[in-house]
């Protein structure tokens, strides 16, 4: 069983928290938000040298990748077409690429040109797949960017499976963006969404701690409201979520929605890793090191809130961890 850390245990190792925060200050001080994010996110991507898990810093991909494969099996036939939104550099897609039938076209939207180039390079190594279109643009700008570049987007009603894997944090209007994504689907097509529940997850609680201690994200009220909105729209219906189905029905793109909660976590080899990981979400845009100070305070003084513990078995034995649950949702267009 994992070793749970309560307030008393946290106080008993108070010097470790102090040292961890000092190390984080030393590493991140003087870095702009982009480089801060790069260093923090690197903790998530740490490879397992023994290949037992996909990455050491989280089990989120380990949990959702099999679900993506199941969505492929039930949604994509030979010569089908998938659309990967906010696609990244192809590392996540690589986990499921071999499950796609021969002749599948892959269309890609990704705002980072370097990531897009890496994705395209990977796609060339998969002879059973074909490139549909590739657009270097944020999803909110997808239609305008396609028109400006001359790139032809997939037609509405043409996509078998769309992927929105941990990318909905970066859209400005969640209901409008999901509606646009579903419009691409053919009847029976699926939009597969993965998003963290930050109402109870570590990064969301770190944001709240930052704000409660007087921190300013530039728009505190909005950043807190979008966390609640994601839960209302995409969370489990039994927990007051699933409202996206009503939104899509009103927009003329009705769906059947299947949502599952996965009790995923974030992991660090030490407390400094966990403090740094607080900056991989909405706090990424904040340059002040105060965000790390309030995350350290949260871990030390409210360890139960983030389910702080030390793993004592499996490939992450000896690592510290905190809760970071995710929702996996399949939205199947009905007409």
Go through each PLM region and give its residues.
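Class I SAM-dependent methyltransferase Rossmann-like catalytic core
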Residues: 12-72
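Short alpha-helix
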Residues: 229-252
